[in-house]
Structure formats: structure tokens, C-alpha cells
Amino acid sequence: DGRYWVMSGQRDYLESRYGLTTEVLVKYPEPHLMAWHEVPGKTPYPYQEKAKAGLLARLHARVEMGTGLGKSFILLNIARELGLRTVIMAPSTSIADQLYQDFVKHLGRKYVGAYYDGKKDFKKLIVIGNAQSLTRIEEGSPAWETMSKAQVFMADESHLCPASTLNRVCSGLLADAPYRFFFSATQMRNDGLDKLLDAITGPTVYSMTVKEGVDQGYLSKPVFRVIKTRSDKNFESDDANEMTREHLYYNTLVLHQAAEVINQSVERLGHQVLVLIDEVEQFTRLRPLLNHKTGFAHGPLTATTFHENGKIKAKGNRESVPKEYWESEPNKLVDQFNAGEFPILIGTSCISTGTDIRTVKTMVYLKGGKSEIEVKQGVGRCTRKVPGKTACSVVDFDVANIAILSKHAKARREIFDDIYGPVQVVDWGS
């Protein structure tokens, strides 16, 4: 009939850029307000109400809000107000699990199911899954037949999902879901597929940066300090990851300087201290330098395996970790840390994104790299505002005599400055 069909998220772009007239043929079912199972102990902030109103007015749209501004609370309220069959996708198991616990608490186990990490409770009104599990659902399977009938699709931290993964879920399993809402701290991409993401998510109807959240009194202010240090190792490699490992992760001087920051923050300032690391071995080397009780949040550890002749077949990471730390329940450890049961929490990527860490007043960032997404997600672990907390110190390290690491540190400083500058630089022996 001479008309073109496009992804519905492209509607605003086509109308504003080319002056085209579009027609929306999507049918939206009537909402059915759900009763609270347990009423939340807080009411939405005005900006959360604005974000929710913008999404519900547009029906297919996204919001961009800095980490710590309560995107998951908006998600919960939208799911309750619509009361329709809903699938919520998180980018990781840790984020999915946090959402699941919140939804079960406030809407009831009767209505909330989980589809991730081996859980396959997909027949509930609201199902929360992670991207990995949802993309593996085969067409025609019982899970597909049930979940493909969802009327609402919501994606939390949508920028952390590859655009191709998001497209597979939105155009496959959830192709018939009319209501579509996307939540993220930023929609920036590392994969160059920004236009595809825009077509999937639709227009941004509300945005608030971390700086805006701090200035308006909703977030704790991150105070950034970068310590210039050095490496005395002679190791050289064309592999930036290997250089980071040798000159930052396993740098004895950096580890001792980090330990000094951690111990002094606890002893002199009375701070709860969060340490973000990339590899288990960093914990193994840092822990003996710390003077206080420490929690360690990590994923499954692997044991070293051997050939019949006794030679190592595959080296694991469990043997280097004290046995008392072999088992880890990240969400439980975060709760204990928030409750003040121990003053130091060291964590790998399992807690660096989408984890509700509240009481941290000093964060030590030992992950290196230059990913804007990873750095901003890490900083987001310390911006939650709670009684008695208005600011959080963020400490990073610049191994100044190693060119590639100093280049990465410069990139992180620029990210810090963009979040909430200025950044203080302190020379501790470069």
C-alpha cells in the first residue's frame, strides 16, 4: 500500500528529521493496578514521578538517570501500575537477583518469577530474567510460549546489553509486547551500534546526571583523588591487559599504598571502605596488608586440575584464597557491609554494577582500564545517599612511569571530572 514499516523506536527520529507522518498501529491493553504486598517505606521523589510519567505518556521510551537515582524503584512502580504480563531483563545475574528480591518483597512471590541462573519460574505475572538466559529461550519451548505473550517489556541498565542482544530479545521473544521501557545511567555504547539502540529503545523522555542529582540533594557527592605512583618491574608487553596486571594489579607498591588508604580511612575517619578489583589474585595479595575484618564478594572460584602425570592441566584461582573466603554470597555480604558488620568490602565485577551499596564513604578503585561504562558504574556504588553521608571519597591510582597505564589513568581522570570535578592529583612517588 506504499507505506514503510520501521522499528517503532525510530518514529520520533523520522518525524523530526524528515518531516514524515507516521501512524502507530500498536494496541495497548488497559492497565490493572496491583495491590502492594508490602508498601515501600519511601515515596517516589519528584524526579522519579516525572520519569515515570514521561514513560507512561510515551508508552515506548527510555530514561537516562545516573546510578543511585533509583531507576529500579521506577521500574517497580510502573510494573505495579500497569499490572499486566511483564518481562523485565537485567544485564547480569546480580542485577536480576536484586530486582527479583525487591519485586517479591513489594508485590509478592505469587506474582513474581525468576528466569536466570538456573531458575525457570516463568509462569508468573511478572518475570525477571537476565539477558543471557532470555536470549537462549528457544522458539516453541514452554518458556517461549508463555513469555512471548508478555504485554510489557522493561530493560534495566540497557546500555550494558550488546545492541544485538537487545534486538534479539525485543524482535524475537518479546516482539509482541506493546509497552516497552528502557532504563539506564547512560545509553552510550562501546560497540558502535548507537542507531540500532535508538531504534530499539525509542526517545529519551527524562534524564538526570550524577552531578544534577548531587546538586539537587539526591545523591552523595563523589570526591575524586588520583594517586600518582610508579612500578619498579621491568615487564614489557604489547598486551595492555598484561601490562595492567603486572604494573597495577600485582604492583607491590600500589598494593601497600592502597592498604594505607584503606586502613587509615577505617582507623582515622571511621569510614566503611569499598574496594573494587578485577581479579581474585588482587584480593589474595591485598588482604594480608589490611588491619580490619574484611568481606570478599566474588563469583565461583575454580580449582586447579592436574594430568595423570601430576602436571597442571588448568590452573584455578581457589587455592590462593584463604578457605574462609571460598564461599561468597555477594548480596548477603553487601547487606552485612551496609549494616556495619565489617568495615571493608572487597569485590570483583559481581558487585561493581547494580548493587545497593549504601554506607561506603571511601572507595578504592583498583580495576584500571578506560571504559567509561565500567568507571561510571563503579563510581555509582558510592553515590547512594543515606543519613550521615553527604560525600564519598573515590581513590584511584596512576602508574605514571608506565605509558599505557598512565594513558588509561588520564582517561579515567577525564571521566571523573565529567562526573563531578575537579579531580585532586597527589604524587606518592612517581
Q: What do the predicted segments below correspond to?
A:
Residues R85-I95, E246-L289, F416:
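Conserved strand-helix element at the start of the C-terminal RecA-like helicase core
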Residues M208-V273:
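Conserved interdomain linker/interface between the two RecA-like ATPase lobes of SF2 helicase motors
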Residues R58-A79, I346:
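Walker A/P-loop
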Residues S72-K105, R189, E279-E281:
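Conserved Walker A/P-loop ATP-binding site and its immediately adjacent core
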